[in-house]
Structure formats: C-alpha cells, structure tokens
C-alpha cells in the first residue's frame, strides 16, 4: 500500500463518517469525492461496504444502552416489543424495493449530475418542511405507532436515489408525520442499523470476490476513520438539533449541488461520466 492509497482511504473514511448520519447524502459525497481523487473500480466497491460498517458501529456504540435495554426487555416488555416491531416495519420497504431496483438505480443514477440535482431538490424540500408549522404528536421513539414506522420506511426508499440522503428523508419524513425533532432523528439512527447492515451483507455477498487479503490495510484505515468521524457526527448532530433546525443542512445541500452543476455546465469539470 503506497502513501497515496492510504490517503485516499483516509479521505473517504472521513467523508463517510461525517456525512452518513447528516442529512446531506453520504452516497452523493462519496461519488463526488471518489471521482475527484480517482478512487474507483472493484476495490472501491468492497471499500465502500467496509466504511459503511465502520459508521454503523459508531451508532451501535452510541446507542448501546438503548439497544441493550431493548434486547433484555424483548421477551416480556411491551415497549421493547413495539419498538422492535416498528423497526422491522420501517425496514421492510427498503428490503423489497432494494432487491428489485438496486442494480438498475446504480447503473443509471450513480453519477455526479444526479447527485447534484437530488441535493438541490432535497434541500428545497427540507427548507419547506422546516418552515411548516409542526404539530408534534409523538415525543419519543417509544411512542411511535406502526403506521408512523411504515410511512418513514416508505420515505426512506427515496434515498435509493443518490444525493437524496437516507437520514435526510427519514428525519424530514418523521417531522412531517408528527414526530418531535429528537424522535425523528433518533429513529433515523436506529433504522440505519438494520438498513445499512442489510445492504452491506447483500453487497458483501454480491461482491465477495472483490475482497482481497492485500487490501486489508486500506480497509482498516477506512473502517477506523469512518467509525471515529461518524461518532463525532452523531454526537454533534444530537446536540445541534436540540437548539437548531435543519435549515443549515438544507442551504449546504443547495449550495453544494449548484456548485457541482455549475462546474459541469461551464465545462470546468466533466462530471457527466462520473460513476461510483
């Protein structure tokens, strides 16, 4: 492993960790940054799976007490049973639609222009959602109904389009469906666990021949970096949303998306053929 390869792994690990749980699209940022630093091919597919697992481990660690309470209480506690059922209900739409459409979406939509367009549109929707008057019906994740979970699960499927943002769609969807800001954000984190682990297992099996022993060091750098920066991002976001709205992320999405479109329109960078 040369120094540049290590630097690429470090950069992409930081990008994944910082963006996975913020409503700004980690996939979109990975596509853009990977193209800029020329990190692609079979190694990139396997590498992306590894760094996503690093990010997920950060959320598992951050919410380990809640997870342990649910596991211990599952046999007897109705609250734990309802929470688990809601997660399963919210998870299933992504499973069904992911199996059906994942390859087609990856082939046709995983490019920088799609990412930029989705960033802008998602940012506008986020601003609109934040400026609406919210009527909070559900204060905590334990108070959610199965219909809330199903609606959030369906909204999560929009994130199959790169640039949309899984966390952005589920958080904003949760707010529109009457969840408090804290409940919408936390449920988005919990829903990420089965969704991302499921996607990683599916992709890992599909691309199992691309995992090679000589790439271990590259994967390790990406995994550890992603874990550390995802932990920072999760803790930072939970503190931030206690006193702020998501408007700053919406404006960032719009500005970043327009910048990408401008560089393409004026011919400064040829994004048209950029692929994940």
Swiss-Prot record:
It is an enzyme of class 3 (hydrolase). The gene is uppP. Belongs to the UppP family. It is a multi-pass membrane protein. This is Undecaprenyl-diphosphatase. GO terms for molecular function: undecaprenyl-diphosphatase activity. It holds the Pfam family BacA. It is found in: Cell inner membrane. Bacitracin is thought to be involved in the inhibition of peptidoglycan synthesis by sequestering undecaprenyl diphosphate, thereby reducing the pool of lipid carrier available. One of its GO terms (cellular component) is plasma membrane. GO terms for biological process: cell wall organization; peptidoglycan biosynthetic process; regulation of cell shape; response to antibiotic. Its main location: membrane. It comes from Pseudomonas syringae pv. syringae (strain B728a).
